From Swiss-Prot:
Superkingdom per UniProt: Bacteria
Chief place of localization: membrane
One GO process term, biological-process aspect: respiratory chain complex IV assembly
HAMAP family assigned: CtaG (MF_00155)
Pfam family, any one: CtaG_Cox11
Function description: Exerts its effect at some terminal stage of cytochrome c oxidase synthesis, probably by being involved in the insertion of the copper B into subunit I.
The keyword Cell membrane appears for this protein: yes
UniProt protein name: Cytochrome c oxidase assembly protein CtaG
KW Protein transport (keyword) present: no
Protein's gene: ctaG
Compartments where found: Cell inner membrane
Amino acid sequence: MALNGPQKTVVQLVSVVVVMGGLAWASVPFYDWFCRVTGFGGATGVAEAGSDTILDKTIKVRFDASKERGMPWEFRPVQTEMELRIGETGLAFYEAYNPTDRPVAGQASYNVAPYSAGGYFDKIACFCFEEQVLQPGERVQMPVTFFVDPEIVNDRDAKYVHTITLSYTFYEIDLPEGYAALDAGEKTNTN
């Protein structure tokens, strides 16, 4: 069946809209994958264990914390910076406090600056890998274990980096189902 002019135009326009919608839907997971693979945008790597190679060259790591507007927690790095040898495993802590009278769940997102160092900053363990739930008045110290990959000294851009900033932003999220039921139960009066 041959399409006449207006029908052909409609089919082409619908096809363009469908393709654009598909590309928009796929762009978020693709961009996430791209950033993790290349370190673009300050995305960091994840490692199972520390580096086998430790260089004599040192690098300073600064720690930064922020929170989304409306997130009721207090959130800060326990120490603001540390200096370690490239390849050496570092351990830093961030502190979170829930000053409210209700449980609050949060999820941390992170990045590394400068962006050229993102692909060489490897986390072994991090509180950002899972959701956090703080009870009313609860204060916790959350660890992050990391190292700077010795391959950074071979990168034409990143080898000149002397300071890396690890930054976390906490966002409030919905309470997990079990916590929501507990919170609702605490608010009901029973005799």
